[in-house]
Amino acid sequence: MARSPRIRIKDNDKAEYARLVKNTKAKIARTKKKYGVDLSAEINIPDLESFETRAQFNKWKEQASSFTNRANMRYQFEKNAYGVVASKAKIAEIERNTKEVQRLVDEKINAMKDKEYYAGGKPQGTIEQRIAMTSPAHVTGINRPRDFDFSKVRTYSRLRTLEESMEMRTDPQYYEKKMIQLQLNFIKSVEGSFNSFDAADELIEELKKIPPDDFYELFLRISEISFEEFDSEGNTVENVEGNVYKILSYLEQYRRGDFDLSLKGF
């Protein structure tokens, strides 16, 4: 392969190099002074004579132009009233991810809202009506985040938490893991409520047999399958033993196929 010819530095090259160096240094100094962010490691400023080929020089010019371009949100920053600084690119990313999480949560709630829920063995209305009496998070175990508002972020740790949480929750596998963890937590709650109770032992074994997505829909639709009815520290609430028998009765109906679990895999 033929080697690229060594660059011949022209007057217009010198002028453009000087302009880009000036703008780059000014950008670094301005950002450091205004936001306390040191960008000096983000771009090199080599001597003009160090470029061996025109291709090398052109590549550096592109990098320097991008670095100083106000449209490059990666190097544009905002500082809120609490002194928290973030790039506009990061703020925009968290906003996008938050909107996507809201969309996913709304999609899941809309898929289940018309389903009947049961209490005392009888239909008591729809899941949407149940949500209206409490909250979506209370019924579904899924929290719908509020719109991201950078002006209200008080600390960098809070910003990192929001960034990581929203990014994680855009992954569909997050909700699959949530269903698995919800089932495990409920089984643990039942286990912690009794020292010795045969019906509870039977319930625990039956719960372990249920696929996580089926359990999640049963959790949504049966009021007795509730953490409020059990206590994982070993203390029981009133009528909890009777509640065990009610859940076993529901699970018998589930095994017979009496529940239309059409949310499976949603």
UniProtKB/Swiss-Prot annotation:
One Pfam entry name: Phi-29_GP3
Checking InterPro entries in the record gives: DNA_terminal_Gp3, DNA_terminal_Gp3_C, DNA_terminal_Gp3_sf
Any single biological process term in GO: symbiont entry into host cell via disruption of host cell envelope
Task: Give an example GO molecular function.
Answer: hydrolase activity
Q: Where in the cell is it found?
A: Virion
Region Disordered, annotated ranges = 1-73
Residue(s) at site: Positions the 3' end of the template strand at the active site of the DNA polymerase: 230
What protein is this chain from?
DNA terminal protein
Question: What is its biological role?
Answer: Acts as a primer for DNA elongation during viral genomic replication. Acts as the small terminase protein during packaging. Recruits the phage DNA polymerase to the bacterial nucleoid. Primer terminal protein (TP) is covalently linked to the 5'-ends of both strands of the genome through a phosphodiester bond between the beta-hydroxyl group of a serine residue and the 5'-phosphate of the terminal deoxyadenylate (dAMP). Hydrolyzes host peptidoglycans during virus entry.
Residue ranges of region Priming?
Answer: 173-266
Q: Give me the Gene Ontology terms describing cellular component.
A: virion component
Domain of life, source organism: Viruses
Give the protein family.
Belongs to the phi29likevirus DNA terminal protein family.
* Quaternary context: Interacts with the viral polymerase; this interaction allows the initiation of TP-primed DNA replication at both viral DNA ends. Binds to ssDNA. Interacts with the replication protein p1. Part of a DNA-gp3-gp16 complex.
Question: Keywords on this record?
Answer: Covalent protein-DNA linkage, Degradation of host cell envelope components during virus entry, Degradation of host peptidoglycans during virus entry, DNA replication, Early protein, Hydrolase, Phosphoprotein, Viral DNA replication, Virion, Virus entry into host cell
Which organism does this sequence originate in?
Bacillus phage PZA
Q: Where is this region: Intermediate?
A: 74-172
The reply to whether Membrane figures as a keyword in the UniProt entry is no
Give positions of region: Interaction with the viral DNA polymerase. 256-258
